[in-house]
Regions:
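Feature marks short, surface-exposed loop/turn motifs that line or immediately flank catalytic pockets
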Residues: 26, 45, 65, 94-97
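A short glycine-rich, Lys/Arg-flanked "PGG" loop and its adjoining helix->strand segment in the class I
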Residues: 70-85
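Class I SAM-dependent methyltransferase SAM/SAH-binding core
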Residues: 1-48
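Core SAM-dependent methyltransferase catalytic element
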Residues: 122-125, 131-150
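A short SAM/SAH-binding and catalytic strip from SAM-dependent methyltransferases
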Residues: 55-70
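Conserved class I S-adenosyl-L-methionine
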Residues: 85-116
Length: 150
């Protein structure tokens, strides 16, 4: 799930990066994407990728806008190879009018627990949360990650 920037290190060698987003201009401007697709996951959570097609899925600051998170993460699980990783990152920054109500009512720990619940309910294992930046020197950054069972 991406936009004009993928937040992937420039020196990280990846065979293929497939992007998802809502804005064709932004996705087209992202140099890390080999290919991309536009889809409103709140309307249609079925991802246009084959079963067990990818090794990892990154969701960067988008989880707070999902109205059908269990369906979306079940799809993420479907497209991941067994043992593949899902990595969900978020901050305390968002568009409050677009974020789901529950997200806005929770603190960072509550949001991490919520994302972990989404992943567990969608068939992921080895779920863990990490505080990568505490927010003292800028925006906080939280990651919740899990592995596809199977």
């Amino acid at each position: 799930m991406s936009s004009w920037v993928s937040h992937l290190p420039a020196d990280l060698s990846i065979r293929e990066v497939i992007g998802h987003g809502m804005n064709a201009t932004e996705l087209d401007a992202n140099p890390r994407l080999d290919r991309w697709f536009i889809q409103n996951l709140n309307r249609d959570p079925v991802l246009p990728l084959s079963d067990a097609a990818v090794d990892a899925v990154l969701c960067c600051v988008g989880v707070q806008y999902l109205t059908r998170p269990l369906e979306v993460f079940a799809e993420v699980r479907r497209i991941l190879r067994p043992g593949g990783r899902v990595i969900v990152s978020f901050s305390n920054r968002c568009f409050p009018m677009k974020a789901v109500r529950l997200w806005s009512a929770l603190d960072e720990a509550g949001r991490a627990s919520l994302v972990a619940t989404y992943l567990e309910g969608s068939g992921f294992a080895s779920i863990a949360a990490y505080l990568l930046a505490d927010g003292k020197a800028g925006d906080p950054l939280v990651v919740v990650a899990g592995a596809a069972r199977g």
